[in-house]
A protein has these predicted regions:
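Conserved CoA-thioester-binding segment of acyl-CoA-metabolizing enzymes
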Residues: 1-55, 67-71
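C-terminal alpha-helix plus adjacent terminal tail
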Residues: 1-9, 57, 75, 170-176, ...
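Terminal peptide-recognition signature
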Residues: 14, 18, 32-33, 50, ...
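Short beta->alpha linker loops
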Residues: 28, 52, 61, 170, ...
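Hydrophobic alpha-helical membrane-association signature
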Residues: 29-32, 193, 234
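An acidic, glycine-rich surface segment that forms the CoA-thioester-binding/catalytic face
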Residues: 30-34, 42, 63-110, 152, ...
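Short, active-site-adjacent cap segments at secondary-structure transitions
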Residues: 55-59, 114, 136, 219
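Crotonase-fold acyl-CoA enzyme core
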Residues: 96-210
């Protein structure tokens, strides 16, 4: 097994543990990650942290495996084709990149998250990067295109022009630049990303989850909609959460809890 799950109450940390290969992704690891994240999505856990053991988040697709995809094995990639219709697609080349989970994932990024590893980082809801970590489309050098959602998620985060520049040059994008342009949400000292991601996960998990997940879903689903359509979606998604938890929360505030922005006693 190259994937481990550590459970701390409502927080799961899903660890890719293949440090001898800089956590490059082969089919075995890809399948194990899909199983782990599907298990998380079905569980009572509220937030997952995605971490690469050994100082590297993920160095991308395992090119030692990729070089074998010729001759009798050339059809293996076809097994990952999207199906006709709306049925669930097979896993991505790097595993969970095609999963649309119902709960948030925080990426804890140490060292390189490059090529397909960058695509996995972009799949996460939130990214916490070490100050010496970096992203980059390093597969540019080897003639391998982005296949795990990079061309979809990158421009949504940084805009089309910056996405094209990063993708076509294949250059290194260091943590501080990632923070500045919206590719990560927090930069922390090296060696502390998992710790800081788990702290953030616990902050998210302690809130009433109907509203947290409703707002997450509305933010994700409203992309591409007009303002009116987006606000209608927000209302449809959110009104039940108000009935389930919001009324009770308002009553607690009226009784004195959480005044003046105090989050300690909620």
């Amino acid at each position: 097994m190259t994937v481990e799950i550590e459970k701390d109450g409502e927080i799961w940390t899903i660890i890719h543990n293949r440090p001898q290969a800089r956590n490059a992704m082969d089919p075995v690891s890809a399948e194990e990650l899909v199983v782990a994240f599907k298990e998380f999505d079905k569980s009572n856990a509220k937030v997952a942290v995605f971490y690469g053991e050994g100082g590297a988040f993920c160095a991308g697709w395992d090119l030692k495996y990729a070089q074998t995809l010729n001759g009798n094995r050339s059809n293996e990639l076809r097994e990952l084709d999207f199906p006709i219709g709306s049925s669930e697609p097979p896993r991505g080349p790097l595993g969970p990149s095609r999963l649309e989970l119902n709960k948030p994932v925080i990426g804890a990024i140490e060292g390189p998250a490059v090529a397909g590893g960058m695509e996995l980082a972009l799949w996460c809801d939130i990214r916490v990067m070490a100050e010496d970590a970096y992203l980059g489309v390093y597969c540019r050098r080897w003639g391998i295109p982005l296949l795990d959602g990079g061309t979809v998620r990158l421009p949504r985060l940084v805009g089309q022009g910056k996405a094209l520049e990063i993708a076509m040059t294949g250059r290194k994008v260091e943590a501080e630049e990632c923070l500045r342009i919206g590719l990560c949400e927090k930069v922390v000292p090296s060696g502390h990303t998992r710790e800081q991601a788990e702290i953030m996960a616990k902050e998210i998990a302690r809130f009433p989850q109907d509203a947290v997940l409703t707002d997450r879903r509305s933010i994700i689903e409203s992309r591409g909609l007009s303002v009116r359509e987006g606000m209608k979606l927000e209302w449809v998604n959110g009104v039940d959460a108000v009935r389930k938890q919001g009324v009770k929360g308002a009553a607690r505030f009226s009784a004195g809890a959480g005044r003046h922005g105090d989050f300690k006693k909620i």
